[in-house]
Amino acid sequence: SRGKALQMVSLDSQRAMAPVWDYALGLAPKDNPFRKTTVKGSQFETPLLEFSGACAGCGETPYARLITQLFGDRMLIANATGCSSIWGASAPSMPYTTNHRGHGPAWANSLFEDNAEFGLGMMLGGQAIRQQIAEELTAALALPVSDALHAAMRQWLAQQDEGEGTRERADRLSALLAEEKEGVPLLEQLWQNRDYFVRRSQWIFGGDGWAYDIDRKSV
């Protein structure tokens, strides 16, 4: 017999590798040299789901991990009660994490059998605030602001529904508002809602029982 593919060994043999792990954690983030929308390119993005503790061979976590690699820094997740709420939020451990800037998925679970409505409500709530921001930015265009802020506001209005580049546009607008908002109530109000400048990526996670039976009447 060739032996088993996996063998249990003492954990003590791996303690010498702890400094290597610590070194890897301290490495600076690297830019992805490929387009992340390709199969190969997606794997150069940092996963924002790690160490889930899901069952061996679980088919859910690879999909969830891939989604975090593509959209994780601006994700909102409405999670149906089931396996994905067990490996996804078994307190005090949470497998969803953040990137080097502190951005990552925001996760919530409804114990009731209404995850479709729950996720839709999350999306509609965010859309309402962003609509308010769009109206306030349109009004702010008439204010005597700098050319740079004027251009940033117009760009945000023109591309508010585009996911590509939304983080960069939001950062630029937020930074300029921080410089010019003093004593201007409308700009102060906009800056207070700066967390919504980024176009959020809303996801609804659930199993086939929920999607095709329990909650099929909904979204």
Q: Where on the chain are the PLM-derived regions?
A:
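Gly-rich Lys/Arg/Thr-decorated short loops/hinges at beta-loop-alpha junctions or inter-strand turns
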Residues: 39-50, 170-174, 198
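Iron-sulfur cluster-binding cysteine motifs and their immediate structural context
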Residues: 1-14, 62, 72
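Conserved small/polar residues in nucleotide/adenosyl-binding loops
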Residues: 219
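Mobile "lid/hinge" segments at catalytic clefts and subdomain interfaces of large enzymes
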Residues: 89-127
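Flexible loop/turn segments at secondary-structure boundaries
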Residues: 13-16, 84-88, 210-214
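A short, small-residue-rich loop immediately preceding and capping a beta-strand
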Residues: 75-79, 200-214
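N-terminal leader/propeptide and maturation segments of large enzyme subunits in energy/redox metabolism
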Residues: 111-186
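N-terminal amphipathic, basic-rich helices that act as targeting or association modules
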Residues: 49-81, 85-92
